[in-house]
Amino acid sequence: MGFAVDNSRDSETENRSAACDLGHNRLGRPTGSRVADVIIDYLSLIGVRHIFGVGGANIEDLYDAAFFNDDLTAVLAKHEFSAATMADGYSRSGIGLGVVAATSGGGCLNLVPGLGESLASRVPVLALVGQPPCTMDGRGSFQDTSGRNGALDAEALFSAVSLHCERILEPADIATALPRAVAAARSGGPAVLLLPKDVQQSVVDLTARDIPTADTVLAADDPGEIAAELRNATGHVTIIAGEQVSRDDAREELERLRAALDARLATVPDAKDAVASSRSSAVIGVTGVMGHPGVASALTKGSLCLLIGTRLPATARSGLDAALSLVSTLSVGSAPPFVPCTHIHSHDLRATLAELTTALERQDPTSRWSSDSPPEELQPPKHRGPGVRYRDAMAILDDALPVDADVVVDAGNSGAAAVHQLSVRPAGRFVIALGMGGMGYSFGAGIGLAFARGRRTVVIAGDGAFFMHGMEIHTAVEYGLPITFVLFNNNAHAMCVTREQLFYDDRYSYNRFRPSRIGAGLAAMFPDLPSRDVESLDALPEALRQALSVDGPSVVSIECSADEIPPFAPFLDNIATKESQPDVAASA
């Protein structure tokens, strides 16, 4: 796997108290099966190998149970938001279900933005949330979230950021509640189990093997409904692939369908890795605000658009509405898109796309897309100030990354540049969270991805994202994870600086920072962490080579400018409007 986690338990086992109310066997594990044991053992049986969380009094029994399971590791994060994004990244890897655990009170409340991202992006995540004992519901207990007698109602709260939320009050109910929650998560989004401490500690006449672990089977529509329309298309077809293609591991099936249709292929921004090769002549780039202009022109030259595994939200649809209005639109996926279309439902794109391809066998497999030409790029204005340019840095990074590297990108200017200009590794993943678009997501998600896939993971983030959740680098150091953090330090929330400049006449800035030396600071904080600042383009190739060659984590902090405009269509459209109509007042 390229990293090691110390699972030695001998000394800790010897130190465990034999005076636990439940009693302990000679190996230290409590006699009988607690609800906490059943949960952990069940997760292990269905293939979960890591759970992510932050400890606390009302979740510690779950960690205790994990200690005694040799097939599952409980990972300690620094913050519950990042623990949730670790589970999200783990799930996006395709390895298995992402699981996050948090204690009651402020700890569980920190899960909300992470689960919100998973809900909006339809990522399967199971959240195990500790609560005070049921006997104290509504009686003023510390961190009471029972909803009784004026207490915060955790069930109502988490129901808003999940597909399924259930509070367990009877220990035996875990036998039905746990598989129900797992099934809900596997349908595409978070599920939450609220677990009072006394329930977790209760001994039940039940083991994990007594609970059914059958795979969730979800109904799908007959793809024949759209096969006829595709077969009878009078012009060429443009496919826009979404994040469900990656989640369902349907890349090969997508390419076979594309070949059968001789279609052009684009992806939404958070599905760059849905295509086998972004350099294929049939690939026309990324859609939306950080996408490629050629997608809209390809749509207008064809007669039909096929959406696969995407709802095409505004971020992915920007600039396409006019083109979409001129063509027929079909859709396959787990949820209907936000645009008018004929939609067929599928929770398993591998199966559905294979069926669709079989129904569309072409007699002439010759492709009309024979010439290799990269997608047309957006052209931001040239920046002549100090700092390394985004485009230049991405070109060097593109040359340096291993063929199997996974890439996780954060929100912001550096993220827009990476989505627009950095190619997907042939054997790697490319992850960006645009459901909620919260800054700091990449640090936890990169850790989850590294645990899941055990290969070099590259996190690309700005200094603003780092100051929010970058201390999860400590988690990468603690577990020796193979993650290279590439930080673009422009001493600002630079995308917000650009908005101040373009939409508010550059009268002020709330979003510029005093200079910081992130690379040097992390090197001082973690003496064993290779970490450096890079101030010139010439120094970047060697810095990346060294950072990517170490066994564990590393950091490269690149000095860039907050005044450089990223490849982000709304900014470029605003600049173009001002240049063509210089007397028109800026509008937000």
Language model regions located:
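N-terminal alpha/beta PP-like core and its mobile active-site loop of ThDP/TPP-dependent enzymes
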Residues: 2-362, 403, 483-485, 517
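Phosphate/pyrophosphate-binding active-site segments
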Residues: 5, 10-31, 169, 192, ...
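Active-site diphosphate/adenylate-binding microenvironment
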Residues: 36-40, 44-48, 54-57, 62-64, ...
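Thiamine diphosphate
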Residues: 128, 136-149, 353, 416-588
